[in-house]
Amino acid sequence: MYKVDLNSDLGESFGTYKIGLDEEVLKYISSANIACGFHAGDPSHMEKTVQLAKKNGVKIGAHPGFLDLIGFGRREMKITKQEAKDYTKYQLGALMAFASSNGCNIQHVKPHGALYNMAAKDKELAMGICEAIYEVDKDIILLGLYNSEMINSAKEIGLRFANEVFADRAYDNNGFLVPRSVEGAVIHDTKHAIDRVVRMVKEGTVETLTGEVIHIKADSICVHGDNPKAIEFVKEIRKRFELESIEVCPLENIEVCSSENIV
């Protein structure tokens, strides 16, 4: 039996602006990445999303990003390692308060948008994020792109980590996500996307945008829940996983890694 986590970015509404179908997607995932007020979200929605996750038995993770509501955290910003560390601690700490007051723990941290993509390649930013998590609670899991600087930094300091793959995104030959601006970067065909996910979980490989086959490790799969079609996609993944004997469970129930248990 294969095991894999299904995660989704949630709690991204703020004020009177509603983003995503959180109540629906929470029925099908095992881990929630909750926005912490920088790129999206606000205190009221953080509280509500934590409560919804708890109600559905979904584990909670912090989803820190750049302080960029207008750009939804998808625009690159030039920051130092210390700033990356401070931003992560600040947002993680905020969500920890909501989690603790609702009788929950923080399972993981997954950076958002441009911060995620930059830290995948920038060792300094990656180390800042990992050090922040380790100093707050070394048992929290970093969720990051396979073979990225985030994962390498986690290994270096002994932070627990899990490798994330994306159901609907294309990869380049180095294992990084193809920018959304490139044609073919987002996979719209449901069957093709699910076939790719099953292959990543069971075979540990993925075909890149140029047709090359590369190695990949899938501990967790990112799925979206921001529109009705996305919800149907998540449902189809769950159905296919049952046929393929793939069990969906949260990261804490999967053998995640640290530098201490890497052979």
Curated annotation (Swiss-Prot):
Keywords: ATP-binding, Hydrolase, Nucleotide-binding. Signal peptide: none annotated. This is 5-oxoprolinase subunit A. It is an enzyme of class 3 (hydrolase). InterPro entries: Glyco_hydro/deAcase_b/a-brl (IPR011330), LamB/YcsF/PxpA-like (IPR005501). PANTHER family: 5-OXOPROLINASE SUBUNIT A, UNCHARACTERIZED PROTEIN YBGL-RELATED. Catalyzes the cleavage of 5-oxoproline to form L-glutamate coupled to the hydrolysis of ATP to ADP and inorganic phosphate. It catalyses: 5-oxo-L-proline + ATP + 2 H2O = L-glutamate + ADP + phosphate + H(+). It comes from Clostridioides difficile (strain 630) (Peptoclostridium difficile). GO terms for molecular function: 5-oxoprolinase (ATP-hydrolyzing) activity; ATP binding. Forms a complex composed of PxpA, PxpB and PxpC. GO terms for biological process: carbohydrate metabolic process. Its EC number is 3.5.2.9. Transmembrane segments: none annotated. Belongs to the LamB/PxpA family.
